[in-house]
From Swiss-Prot:
Organism: Elaeis guineensis var. tenera
Name of the featured protein: Unknown protein 1
Superkingdom to which the source organism belongs: Eukaryota
Length: 7
């Protein structure tokens, strides 16, 4: 759940 990460 971040701009570049998926969680």
């Amino acid at each position: 759940s971040t701009e570049q990460e998926d969680p």
